[in-house]
């Protein structure tokens, strides 16, 4: 089911990038742009994980963030759940 949603979602992002984004002007603080990042994340990790990564990216795309080069990660486990935040079952 997720693959059935993936292609139309990427198509919607392409339409946004081509038709709506030029009207709004360049506002993204990152390279690649947030829409390109979303397309790459969805294509690489599937619909749900891709949307999660894209939402996290959009939350970072704001004036208090310096921006810069921020590609889609190669490995989602290190991006979404870093070792310092994983539950090991040992509590102090």
Curated annotation (Swiss-Prot):
Residue numbers spanned by region Disordered: 69-92
Family classification: Belongs to the UPF0161 family.
Keywords: Cell inner membrane, Cell membrane, Membrane
Top-rank taxon, per record: Bacteria
Name under which the protein is recorded: Putative membrane protein insertion efficiency factor
Compartmental location: Cell inner membrane
Name of one Pfam family that matches: YidD
GO CC annotations, alphabetized: plasma membrane
Its membrane topology: Peripheral membrane protein
Chief location of this protein within or outside the cell: membrane
Functional description taken from the UniProt entry: Could be involved in insertion of integral membrane proteins into the membrane.
